[in-house]
Amino acid sequence: MSIKQYSQEQLKQMALVEIAHEIFSEHKKPVPFQELLNEMISLLGVTKEELGDRIAQFYTDLNIDGRFIALSDQTWGLRSWYPYDQLDEETQPTVKAKKKKAKKVVEEDLDLDEFEEVDEDDIDLDEIEEDIDLEADSFDDEDIDEEDDDELEIEDEMIEEDEEDYDDEEEDRKD
């Protein structure tokens, strides 16, 4: 049945997805989403504002319904028009190469002769471990304890000052 054979009342009772399917079947070619909306508006005899509340749901339904396929540039069509092998070619947007201005790159040549080659057999791991152990032994835990004590004393002084200020404020309120 052609879309034009439906009465205005029948069209208003149909789901927008069903109307879209009828439009695609009649046109037999992909249609941009905006043109599809415009044709639906004219068929239903409503304004875009009146249809506005239903447009989001309609777009969601188009995406979910397996009969439709989104092609490039907001163009939609019926999936049945495209054999499986052709789908990848039609649906993938063409990638435009961006032209970039060539940047001048100054490369500093590294003189590899400056670096000394080290043979792994020449490295004495025992000596390195001894150095690490010596550094660990020279670390003094008492230094940390003294720093902690100093911080605690400062915090205690601040608390005492705050308590004094609070007591002074209470006395002022009583007077």
Swiss-Prot record:
GO terms for biological process: DNA-templated transcription; regulation of DNA-templated transcription. Gene3D superfamilies: RNA polymerase, subunit delta, N-terminal domain (1.10.10.1250). One of its GO terms (cellular component) is DNA-directed RNA polymerase complex. It holds the Pfam family HARE-HTH. It comes from the Bacteria. Residues 14-81 form the HTH HARE-type domain. RNAP is composed of a core of 2 alpha, a beta and a beta' subunits. The core is associated with a delta subunit and one of several sigma factors. Belongs to the RpoE family. Participates in both the initiation and recycling phases of transcription. In the presence of the delta subunit, RNAP displays an increased specificity of transcription, a decreased affinity for nucleic acids, and an increased efficiency of RNA synthesis because of enhanced recycling. This is Probable DNA-directed RNA polymerase subunit delta. The gene is rpoE.
